[in-house]
A protein has these predicted regions:
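A short, hydrophobic C-terminal helix/tail in secreted or cell-surface proteins
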Residues: 275-280
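Conserved short alpha-helical segments that host acidic/polar catalytic motifs at enzyme active sites
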Residues: 1-223, 228-274
Length: 280
């Protein structure tokens, strides 16, 4: 279990708002925190062990500039409790890519072996999230783009979905494209989209983070689907998985999520009241 955030604003720096959003999902992970931003030219990243207020002493977020950004709070389910495992993870091949992941890849070892055999990358951690990052980067490189477009991202994601098993909800920066969010074909981990009247968008693990920061809930990211918010604020949506079967993790309703969150149109607190036994 981890908490992830993605944010786009038409003109303003998003690092402070990502900081505020990470506070709202802090309950999903206290091991480490990180923020990455993109200003259409440069990617900035800071991550450390600790809770959000320890890693970022103020909401100024250590001068992370950019109108597109992602954030992560970590609860370790794979890898170890070391700063090298803190997210977001970064790759510069074939373009600047930064990824924040909530979930567990059940075939991570198989995918890691496959990638090592391609000689496309090396690995610095034991994290399955680093595997997911490099798998996407590898598939993106295979599109052989001249000018990177959203169609190349969707094509790469379709290949990722063919190969990956397990649960994943992801926010990602792809330089030259924008903010990407996608969710596994079973919808095991939650992911929601919100919007403000000023044209800014937020993606978050829980709807409670949207409402706390004044975003109107748009919809859940559908299982097996991806959303791209371009650097110009244009939203594209696409189905990437060949087969979809909605099977959310029940622990999201009764343990992981805040009671004021709504997951796939179901209130977490209402679900708990319906399922927990009563004393008689």
């Amino acid at each position: 279990m981890c908490g992830i955030i993605g944010l786009y604003h038409p003109t303003e720096n998003v690092s402070g708002e990502i900081y505020d959003a990470l506070i709202q999902v802090q309950h999903r992970g206290q091991d480490a925190a990180g923020i990455a931003t993109w200003d259409n030219k440069k990617l900035s990243l800071h991550k450390e062990l600790g809770v959000v207020t320890e890693v970022f002493k103020t909401s100024e977020s250590l001068g992370l500039d950019g109108n597109v950004g992602i954030g992560h709070v970590r609860y370790p389910t794979a890898g170890c409790s070391d700063v090298s495992e803190a997210q977001p993870f970064y790759s510069s091949n074939p373009v600047n890519i930064c990824l924040a992941h909530n979930g567990t890849l059940t075939n991570s070892d198989e995918m890691k072996k496959f990638l090592l055999e391609t000689h496309f990358c090396q690995f610095n951690t034991q994290s399955d999230s680093e595997v997911l990052l490099n798998l996407f980067a590898y598939e993106l490189s295979k599109t052989k783009f001249d000018v990177l477009q959203s169609s190349h991202v969707f094509a790469a994601l379709r290949e990722v979905y063919k190969r990956c098993e397990g649960g994943f909800a992801v926010t990602m920066i792809v330089g030259g494209v924008g903010l990407i969010a996608f969710r596994d074909a079973n919808g095991i981990r939650p992911l929601v989209l919100g919007k403000k009247g000023d044209g800014s968008f937020m993606v978050a693990s829980e709807s409670s983070a949207l409402s706390a920061l004044g975003y109107d809930f748009e919809h859940d990211v559908d299982p097996g689907s991806a959303i791209i918010i371009s650097e110009e604020g244009v939203v594209e949506k696409g189905v990437c998985a060949e087969s979809i079967s909605h099977s959310p993790c029940l622990f999201e309703f009764v343990y992981f999520s805040r009671p004021d969150s709504v997951i796939d149109s179901i209130s977490a607190v209402s679900y708990t009241h319906l399922t927990l036994p009563t004393n008689r």
